[in-house]
């Protein structure tokens, strides 16, 4: 099952050229870029691991692409995403986020159902990869 989080997630994987164009766009808007990775793809997992430091004053897309290539070398078997942060007054938030690397096999999720008080049914989404493997060995 293909993980769909962030911009472009329903499109085919972006090429490096397309990623660089998005980075160029973000830099032209004055947004700071950063690279994050995870091996826990749960839809509610918003706290991915930060790769290196945020690239605040970078004006050259090649520097961002270099960091992406380094992250791919170290975390090739997991998910890697790029974020653009708009620090302007009134926004101060992530304005663009997209996945740039995926594991070869994405096993997907399952729905766990549990009965609560008064026959209330509670649902939880769990990842097959997280249930089967410890952190750091999932992909």
From Swiss-Prot:
GO molecular function annotations of the record: ribulose-bisphosphate carboxylase activity
Main location: plastid
InterPro entries: RuBisCO_ssu, RuBisCO_ssu_dom, RuBisCO_ssu_sf
Keyword Chloroplast appears in the UniProt entry: yes
Domain of life: Eukaryota
Keywords: Calvin cycle, Carbon dioxide fixation, Chloroplast, Photorespiration, Photosynthesis, Plastid
Localization: Plastid, Chloroplast
BP terms from Gene Ontology: reductive pentose-phosphate cycle
Disulfide bonds: none
Gene Ontology cellular component list: chloroplast
Entry annotated with the keyword Cell inner membrane: no
Pfam families: RuBisCO_small
HAMAP family in alphabetical order: RuBisCO_S_bact
Protein family: Belongs to the RuBisCO small chain family.
Role: RuBisCO catalyzes two reactions: the carboxylation of D-ribulose 1,5-bisphosphate, the primary event in carbon dioxide fixation, as well as the oxidative fragmentation of the pentose substrate in the photorespiration process. Both reactions occur simultaneously and in competition at the same active site. Although the small subunit is not catalytic it is essential for maximal activity.
Miscellaneous section: The basic functional RuBisCO is composed of a large chain homodimer in a 'head-to-tail' conformation. In form I RuBisCO this homodimer is arranged in a barrel-like tetramer with the small subunits forming a tetrameric 'cap' on each end of the 'barrel'.
Subunit field text: Heterohexadecamer of 8 large and 8 small subunits.
Protein name: Ribulose bisphosphate carboxylase small subunit
Organism: Cylindrotheca sp. (strain N1) (Marine diatom)
């Amino acid at each position: 099952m293909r993980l769909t989080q962030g911009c472009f997630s329903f499109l085919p994987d972006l090429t490096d050229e397309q990623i660089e164009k998005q980075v160029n766009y973000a830099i032209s808007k004055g947004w700071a870029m950063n690279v994050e990775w995870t091996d826990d793809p749960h839809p509610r997992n918003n706290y991915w691991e930060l790769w290196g430091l945020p690239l605040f004053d970078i004006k050259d897309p090649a520097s961002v692409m270099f960091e992406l290539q380094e992250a791919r070398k170290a975390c090739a078997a997991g998910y890697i995403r790029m974020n653009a942060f708009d620090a302007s007054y009134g926004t101060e938030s992530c304005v663009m986020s997209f996945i740039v690397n995926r594991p070869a096999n994405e096993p997907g999720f399952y729905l766990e159902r549990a009965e609560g008080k008064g026959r209330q049914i509670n649902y939880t989404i769990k990842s097959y990869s997280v249930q089967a493997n410890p952190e750091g060995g999932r992909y």
